[in-house]
Amino acid sequence: MTEVQPPPAQSTVATADTPSLAPDTTLETSTSTELAPITTEQTIITTNAEGKKVKKIIRRKRRPARPQVDPATFKTDTPAPTGTSFNIWYNKWSGGDREDKYLSQTAAQGRCNVARDSGYTKADKTPGSYFCLFFARGICPKGVDCEYLHRLPTVTDIFPSNIDCFGRDKHSDYRDDMGGVGSFQRQNRTLYIGRIHVTDDIEEIVARHFQEWGQIERTRVLTARGVAFVTYMNEANSQFAKEAMAHQSLDHNEILNVRWATVDPNPQAAKREAHRIEEQAAEAIRKALPAAYVAELEGRDPEAKKRRKIEGSFGLQGYEAPDDVWYAKEKAEWEAAKEIEAAGGAAXPRQMIESGEDAHAHEADCAAMQVAPSGQHSQGNGIFSTSTLAALRGYTAAPAKPKVAPVAGPLVGYGSDDDSD
């Protein structure tokens, strides 16, 4: 058993319409952020005769997807009836045999050429569109009028676990022959390829043909048996490659048998899969948390410990805040900063786009809303407002009158019943 790391899937090809660049020129390729980007932008940074860096933007219009076969002569071969009703979506008879034994011995009608056939379709204007199954098989007659995507899946193309990239429903378990759409019980990114013509360079042939459909993580080849296992980085790419390479041939006239691979019993494979899942989860957490917080957790910020030791005491000598208290404080500060930032963005000055009478009306409304100057506004460098200071200046303190002490009467008259007193 031999392990082969395939060469990179992307390559740079120089064309006649490519402008000549200086040796110190750098290229930055960017794609429009629209839902259906019809044009692509290429930024060229070069140095002119004066020694200054010049930035040029080259916009190229995306080409439309071309029909892979002639619509007038296109027809699908219906397999021999083995059931009661034929399902055109799965290309099989329901209620009959799972697979015709002669179907696997028939070569595919066409083959997808990504560099030549891919382009934009009607599906690029619809969010959540699926990929064209006939495009993957190389026999789509609609071209730009197709309602499905005509391109390769990327890491940003995420679908529910019970649906594949072509919009077909998965099943609870795999078929006995490991064919079909697959199961939603686990994420399978590995393909089994059988009936390969055995040669000395079988590893290079398998890597060259299967890297066309996406980035490959790992390739295993059993040279003596003519069998290979190809693992893709993305599950959608493995689903696309399975349909694209089914009943195809490599460098010889063999007819490939492409199936889903079973669970690898090797303990190292289980460890690699667990490690990959942990890396994906860690990357998702890194993107969700602030960069400073992630650097502190990973120990990449040496000043974080000093700052926590100083600020975590909360002014109490010898006190060190627990982790939950410190992280709650950091979370509160982070949320407060986000609220301030959001409020600042909402309070940005409004652009004045009115003209003519609308502008005069807007100015009149603003003038009517202004308050009288000295009575309401406060001084910029004082504590009290202008109105308060004016009231204090006009206030005059009157001298308080001395209280008159009450005159005490004779003791003989106290408590007397005589009215003359």
Curated annotation (Swiss-Prot):
Annotated localization: Nucleus
GO biological process, alphabetically ordered: mRNA cis splicing, via spliceosome; positive regulation of cell cycle; positive regulation of RNA splicing; spliceosomal snRNP assembly
Segments passing through the bilayer: none
UniProt zinc finger (C3H1-type) residues: 126-153
Protein's UniProt keywords contain Ion transport: no
Entry GO terms, CC: Prp19 complex; U2-type catalytic step 1 spliceosome; U2-type catalytic step 2 spliceosome
Region (Disordered): 1-32, 59-80
Keywords: Cell cycle, Metal-binding, mRNA processing, mRNA splicing, Nucleus, RNA-binding, Spliceosome, Zinc, Zinc-finger
Domain RRM residues, every copy: 189-263
Main location: nucleus
GO molecular function: pre-mRNA binding; U6 snRNA binding; zinc ion binding
Source taxon at top rank: Eukaryota
Keyword Zinc-finger found: yes
PANTHER family the UniProt entry points to: PRE-MRNA-SPLICING FACTOR CWC2 (PTHR14089:SF2), PRE-MRNA-SPLICING FACTOR RBM22 (PTHR14089)
Subunit composition and interactions: Associated with the spliceosome.
UniProt similarity note: Belongs to the RRM CWC2 family.
Designated name of the protein: Pre-mRNA-splicing factor CWC2
Gene: CWC2
